[in-house]
Design a protein with these regions (language model features):
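Sec-dependent N-terminal signal peptides
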Residues: 4-14
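Lipid interaction determinants
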Residues: 17-89, 102-157
């Protein structure tokens, strides 16, 4: 009787572990977006006009994502010594449900962007992250599609 009870408890524990794994598989694993990402290209589509920016020349942009927050930093590669000097930074918390990624921009050097939520669809394929969604801020007359293509920054250790 004692052996039957122990066998039953062991069976329940094993099945519980298996069920948890199956539930994770059924729900789908979270996309592996955590890490540091370097922006390769940014495409803005606004009022029928498309602007593609190459972030591998003359400027650089990175996004850092941990388990609850994101931050971005961008600057020109001429160290601010020409007419195209640039620095921008921002960040906040985010949520991720399947491929639906929402950023809440709490901090930004362009303060009028603060406090806004931006909804994106994200895809990760190997070391590439593609983020696509609408940026809309009525008070600034911003209403555009933004498509960003990132590559994961490898550790240099």
């Amino acid at each position: 009787m004692k052996n039957s009870f122990l066998f039953f408890v062991l069976l329940v524990v094993l099945l519980s572990c298996n069920t948890t794994t199956e539930n994770k598989e059924a729900k789908g694993e979270e996309l592996p977006i955590q890490g540091t990402w370097k922006l390769l290209t940014g495409t803005l589509i606004e009022k029928g006009d498309t602007t593609v920016t190459d972030y591998t020349k003359e400027k650089e942009f990175i996004k850092i994502i941990n388990d609850t927050h994101f931050a971005f930093l961008s600057h020109d590669l001429s160290k601010g010594k020409n007419a195209d000097s640039l620095f921008s930074a921002g960040g906040g918390n985010y949520s991720l449900h399947d491929s639906s990624y929402t950023e809440h921009l709490a901090y930004c050097n362009d303060r009028q962007w603060e406090g806004n939520d931006f909804h994106f669809i994200v895809r990760v394929q190997n070391d590439t992250l593609i983020q696509q969604g609408i940026e809309k801020i009525d008070s600034l007359s911003v209403d555009r599609m933004n498509v960003e293509k990132y590559v994961r920054v490898k550790d240099h250790l």
